[in-house]
Swiss-Prot record:
Native organism: Cupriavidus sp. (strain PS12)
Class in the EC hierarchy, top level: oxidoreductase
Catalytic activity: chlorobenzene + NADH + O2 + H(+) = (1R,2R)-3-chlorocyclohexa-3,5-diene-1,2-diol + NAD(+)
The protein's role, per its UniProt record: Part of the oxygenase component of the chlorobenzene dioxygenase system that catalyzes the dihydroxylation of a range of aromatic compounds, including chlorinated benzenes and toluenes, and dinuclear aromatics such as biphenyl and dibenzo-p-dioxin. The beta subunit is not directly involved in the control of substrate specificity.
Protein encoded by which gene: tecA2
Protein's name according to its UniProt entry: Chlorobenzene dioxygenase subunit beta
Length: 187
């Protein structure tokens, strides 16, 4: 079973309410992150990632109900992304390079984030977050991709201007078949 699904079992029941200030602070962090991605300010976005980041997007398969727990590939199995900081830095270099053909000319993206639910993490100063997302991407003249799904993040408080860093991101897309030509952008 997918580790982050087990980790996010905290969201099988309604989480305890958090202070409105914390809810607002985390939502503003996500809106800022989306703005950085939409504006292709990737170096600034990369600074939001923790040095020990795990960025994971499992493969989703359609399963019958009794096998629903096998719907997503797990850590260590095949995945669209299973990246640490070094892999993320390599992806960042590729999308900002003049020779990175998959993003030259650049995609136009819009990241929408909502339904932010927050629970205390296992460590003081960490929070488990579930959020819904839509990523709209237009590339070249007619290429259009829309992705919807859930992000399960672990955020850690830090002393930066944004107040948080992303320690773990698991992207659970609603599609089981990806029709896009590539996944050369960030969720």
């Amino acid at each position: 079973m997918l580790d982050s699904v087990k980790r996010a079992d905290v969201f099988l029941r309604k989480p305890a309410p958090v202070a409105p200030e914390l809810q607002h602070e985390i939502e503003q962090f996500y809106y800022w992150e989306a703005k950085l991605l939409n504006d292709r300010r990737f170096e600034e976005w990369f600074a939001l990632l923790a040095a020990d980041i795990h960025y994971f997007m499992p493969i989703r398969t359609t399963r019958i109900m009794r096998d629903a727990r096998l719907e997503y590939s797990g850590t260590g199995e095949h995945a669209h992304f299973d990246d640490d900081a070094a892999m993320m830095k390599g992806r960042l270099r590729k999308v900002t390079s003049d020779v990175g053909w998959s993003e030259n000319p650049a995609s136009r993206t819009r990241h929408l984030v909502s339904n932010v639910m927050i629970a205390d993490g296992p460590v003081e100063g960490e929070y488990e977050i579930s959020s819904a997302f839509i990523v709209y991407r237009n590339r070249l003249e007619r290429q259009l991709d829309i992705f919807a799904g859930e992000r399960r993040d672990t955020l850690r408080r830090n002393k930066t201007e944004t107040g948080f860093e992303i320690v773990n991101r698991t992207i659970l897309i609603d599609q089981s078949t990806i029709l896009a030509n590539n996944l050369s952008f960030f969720f």
